[in-house]
Amino acid sequence: GVWSTVLGGLKKFAKGGLEAIVNPK
């Protein structure tokens, strides 16, 4: 549904943000 898509996007965004903080380029 819509919520699963939204939550999936948020998780993906959060994961990318964490990776950027933990392993900056």
Curated annotation (Swiss-Prot):
This is Antimicrobial peptide 2. It comes from Xenopus tropicalis (Western clawed frog). Keywords: Amphibian defense peptide, Antibiotic, Antimicrobial, Secreted. GO terms for biological process: defense response to Gram-negative bacterium; defense response to Gram-positive bacterium; hemolysis in another organism. It is found in: Secreted. The keyword Secreted applies. Has very strong antibacterial activity against Gram-positive bacterium S.aureus and very weak activity against Gram-negative bacterium E.coli. One of its GO terms (cellular component) is extracellular region. Expressed by the skin glands.
